[in-house]
C-alpha cells in the first residue's frame, strides 16, 4: 500500500478523504488544493481549485470517472465543477490513471472531462468485456484489475 512506502512522494489532492488517508505516513507530503468545498463530494471544486492545479507538475494522476463512453470516446462525470477539476488534472499530468467500477464503461455523466487519448491506464474491479478491450486497445489504454 502506498501509505507505507519508503519512497518520498508528494500527493496533491482536493479530496478530504485522501488527505486523511496519509495522515500518519512519514514519507508522504500531502498538499491540499483549496477551492469551494462541496459537501456531497467531500472535496474542493471550482475555478479556484482549477487555478491552483495549473501550477503543479504532476507525474501520475489518479482520477475517478462517473462514466467512460467507449463508442463516442469520452470520460464523464455528474458534477460540472468536479469535471473541470478533473479536466485540468488530466491536462497537467504525465501519466493518467482512471479509477472506476467496471459497470461505468456503459454509463454517461452529463459533463465530459476528457477522452481516451488522455488516459494511460484504467484501474477497475474486474476485466472488461471483449468489446471494451478492443476499443481501449485502439487508444493504447492499459487495464489494471
Can you describe what each PLM-predicted range is?
Residues 34, 64-66, 100-103, 125-126:
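Short secondary-structure boundary segments
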Residues 2-6, 89-94, 113-118, 136:
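Short, conserved loop/helix-junction motifs that constitute active-site signature segments
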Residues 10-16, 97-100, 120-126:
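Short internal beta-strands
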